């Protein structure tokens, strides 16, 4: 196990995530207990993947929410890895799991262990009795942990749970898109969390910003229309946020 993976394992313990369960809502966990502010915004499929920086002493992670949610979650975990590994400012145009750059390798290993912990993977495989994973195993594993099939297969390879020849064959099938058809046939439903919820809004500001804006509405300092403009949502969404306390999450 690398130092980055051990740090991720320790971080799961610190965040109260245990050593095997999926992360139910990564954004809320990291904003509540990870000490970072996270902003999501649509930048297009070819836009910046994510960045990490500290602004006025506050760690900020900005993520392109245009890609599929499984990619967005990994990018969030990757940027959080830069934060916890002390890498300083990081600007990632793409998240390349095959990168050999030292910082990128560390952030990728951290993200993979945070989202799909080795202990959990082993126990999950044993519960299924899969001696050698096939495409269905990879699809179900990815779905269980809310990651992509590429990440799930990479974890199986990293932890030596799949033979090289089998991995290459599975990689080719994933690149051909067969996993998507299989997921549909198996009736696998996507993880519902802040990432999937906020995609329809286009922009998600950090919780601390949303709290400040809604508090200003409650105090009569600004009206609903102004709040909607500052939060990049419509007035109906502002009403829903106030009613359900979403700015506090």
What are the language-model segments listed below?
Residues 1-249:
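Active-site hotspot residues in diverse enzymes, especially metal/ion-binding acidic/histidine motifs
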